[in-house]
Structures are given as structure tokens and as C-alpha cells.
Amino acid sequence: MRHFTYHSDVVVWQYIFESGAATNYITRGRALKKLQLSLKDFRRLCILKGVYPHEPLHKKKVNKGSTENRVYYYAKDINFLASEPIIRKFREYKIFLRKLTTAKAKRDEERIKTLYENRPEYQLDHIVKERYPTFESALRDLDDALCLLFAFAVLPHTKIITSSLVASSRRLTAEFNHYIIESNSLNKVFVSIKGIYYEAEVMGERVTWIVGHDRGMGHVSEVDFSVMATFAEFYVTMLEFVNFRLYQSVGLFYPPKLAFKSDKLEDDDQAEEGRVYSLACPLSKFENYEEQIDASIGDEVDNVLNEKLCDVEKRKQLFANYRFWLNREVPKDVLAIIIRSCGGLVSWENCPAAQYYENDAQITHQIVDRPLLDSHKNISRCYVQPQWVFDSFNRRSCLSIKKYLPGAILPPHLSPFSSDYDTYEEQLNQLRLLSKASANVTNRMETEAENKVQERKKIQKEKEVPIINVNKGRMHKENLQKKLNEKGHELKLREMLIPKKRRRVYSKIKRGIKRRVHEEKKLNEKRLKMLKAAD
């Protein structure tokens, strides 16, 4: 389509929808035709390459005057995808499926076996290097990778979620947990209803991820696992690169090797893999490995580094002289990570890499989550609930075990991710003191009022009051309700004088004030409930 304009007796032809925004975007249908891919393969390719749809500012210009809703991509992104070698593998896999269907129809078992052995496979190494040119860029995107792979590590096998993907997710997450333990990089842990939140400082980058609680996972139909499986497939390759680099930085062998062999006569690969997954045994390091610290740093950076080193030393020595035994009902992985990060030893029943057993006399603490019978208790060890480990780690000091005994009502488990975590306990103590002081004051006032009443009665009995007719006087009392009504009426009159363009802003401010008052009231009620429960 074209139209023309006149400029000093010269006709200039202008083609509509062939320049500007109309050429910068391309619809998904045109992209599929250009790449000659199915919608399923196109989605996989976009996820792997990190290409996402975009919303144009002027849909009518891009869609050639039409207002129909469509999915748009940048044309340069589609041109970028056209040169991807994985597209050829997708086409080969399509041919493989066609040949496999023919062989199954003919019941040719040898042909089927040969096709399965030679089926096309693709590698994602070059895509990982392309999307993360530096190691720091990979660490910045590590949060999503860990959250997804920890979720896939406990999912049941299905047609979409293959056993190899679940096994790879479990292996890589266990390797990352070992790095967190060996490098003492864990900073915060918080247990919530959704799961367990972790925060660690990995090579200068803060990484936060969530791990679900240990429970059986049933069939979930509300989630599109085909999309998530593609993300997990990419993150598996990415985490392999990251784990290798992290293990090299702290002097560990990769793949990981245990520091000592178990007493059990199990030399097969599965037994070794189970011992690595248990997180109870340390890993072996390179010989003559020394941790390198950059000496060319300024004074300000040096002070920050000293604070971090002091914090790391506190964490290392927190459980240094303790041995823990975990009962069957408590979560193993999270407690093993925290205890071993703080220098302690941990073991449990049927632990693949157990260094000691339940009857060991050197055990100092036993973690239980249900009341024990007196006949089953050992006098030489302390019995505490799991929250004691979490709270002690977040406070960087071993707390008193009186509040964490089996069967006791636990204190509130505070989140270390909140900004007022350090001052919250001080506020709770102040509130307790204030509540006690207010209770004493009210009791004292009541007793004083009773004493005054009794004294007045005695005085009235002792004195003989003459009979005098006295009329009661009338006190002028202000009607508070009338005052409030007048103030409200004045406020409404002032609101009516607000211009129309300012009225919406005023209503937003008013709603915000009401919401803050309501939230403050709810928080105060919750705080009083927590104080009553703590007392």
C-alpha cells in the first residue's frame, strides 16, 4: 500500500507499513513460517535462547491498521534464532519420530533398537556460554536456577519429567549444598509455610533460593510442566558449569569425592552417590591448597572484609565442639547444612556416610520434634527442637535450650530477611517490661481507689451531717459527639472545595492512611498475642 505527496513539483512515493515500527516487529505465525518449526519446538528454542515476546507501543501501526491481538517478537531476535544449530537437531528429531512410528507399525524390533541407539541429541554448552559471557552474570541468575532444580529434584517421574532430568537435578543440588558447607557461605535460613529460605554469599554475590519441605508430591495438573522442563534442562547445563567453577575456587575435586571411605562394604557407584547426597560427610580437597585473598584493597574495603571474616569465623566455631544426632521426624538436609557449616558433626539413623551412631557417648545434642519418654532419654546429651538450630544460627550464638526443650511452646521464629530483625527482640523485651509495669500500675491504682473509698465511708460514719436541703447544681458538659459531627461536617465542606483533578489524589491519600491505621492495629493485636504465648 502506498500514497504520494507533492514537494516543489516532485512526486514522492511513501510506502505505508514498510518502515519504522511495522518492520521492527514480527508476529509469532510469521516467525514459525520463517523458521519452519512447530509451536512446541519454537517455544523450546525461545526458552533456551532467552528470547521473549514484546508488546509494541503502537499495535495498529505494527499490525498494518488492524487491532487484532497477536503475539509479537523483535524481528532481529527471530533473525538471531534462524542461525541456531539446534534447529537442525529439532528437524532431525522430527525425522527420527517419523521413522520410529514406521518401524513400530512394521514391528521391526531391530530397527526400533537401532533408532533408539542413534537418536539425535543436542548440547546446550554453547548457549550457556552465549547467554552468560562472564561467571558473575551466571551467578546473578543463579536464584531461579536453584529454585527450579530443587523443586525438580523431588518430583515423580512422568512422560515430560524424565528420570534423567530428576537425577541430574538431585545430583547438582547436592553438589551445590556441599559447596555451601565447605565454603561456609551460608548467611541466613528461615523456615516458612512455603518452604525453607536460604541466603548465601557466593563469590561476592548474594544468592537466595527456596527449598520445599520433605513431603510426598502427588500429581499436579495445574502446572505446564513442558515449559518448566525446558527451563530445567537449560539450568542443569548452566549449574554444571557453575558447580565446576565453584569447586575449583575452594580446592575441591569435581565430581566430588568423599574425604574418607565408609566402613560398610559398598563399593558400587550407587552407594558412593548416596553417601554424597547425605551431606553428612566432608569432601576431599586438593593437596597443598591455600585460600587466596586479594591483598590490593583499600582501607574501606578492608574494614568490610574484616567484618565478613569475623562473621565467617563466628559461624565456623558456632557448633565446633558439638555432635548432633537427628531423629527420624526432623528434616535432615537443612539441619546437616547448618550444623556442618558451623563446624559441627551430624549423623542420623541409616545415614549412608555415618561417622558415629546413636549410642555414641560423645553426642552432645539430639534433635527431636516430638516428646520423648523418660526411659529413652540419655542424661549425657541435650534434647532440643529443630528451631534451636535455626535461631542459634541466625543469632550467631548458641541460645539457651530452656525454651526449646521437647514439648515446650517455642518462641516466635523470626525472619532474618526483615530489616528490623536485630531490633525486634529488643522491642519484644521492652513490650514485656511495659506490659508488666502497666499491670503493676493498674493493680496499685485499684488498691489506692479502694482505700480512698473505705476512708470516705469511715469519715461519713464518724461525722454527723446536719440535714440541709441543697439543690443539685448543673455542670456545663461539652457534647463530644456534637463536636465530632461538626468537625466531620467541616471536613466534608472542605473536601467539596477540592478541584476535580486533585480529588482522586486526595482519595488515594485518604485510603492509604486508613490502610496504615488498620495494618498497625492488626500488628499490635498480633504482637500482644505473641507476648501472651511467650509468657
From Swiss-Prot:
Residues 314-406 form the BRCT domain. GO terms for molecular function: ribonucleoprotein complex binding; RNA binding. It is found in: Nucleus, Nucleolus; Nucleus, Nucleoplasm. The keyword Nucleus applies. GO terms for cellular component: nucleoplasm; PeBoW complex; preribosome, large subunit precursor. The keyword Membrane does not apply. It comes from the Eukaryota. Its main location: nucleus. Keywords: Nucleus, Ribosome biogenesis, rRNA processing. CDD domains: BRCT_pescadillo_like. GO terms for biological process: maturation of 5.8S rRNA from tricistronic rRNA transcript (SSU-rRNA, 5.8S rRNA, LSU-rRNA); maturation of LSU-rRNA from tricistronic rRNA transcript (SSU-rRNA, 5.8S rRNA, LSU-rRNA). It holds the Pfam family BRCT_2. Belongs to the pescadillo family. PANTHER family: PESCADILLO - RELATED, PESCADILLO HOMOLOG. HAMAP family: Pescadillo (MF_03028). Required for maturation of ribosomal RNAs and formation of the large ribosomal subunit. This is Pescadillo homolog. It comes from Brugia malayi (Filarial nematode worm).
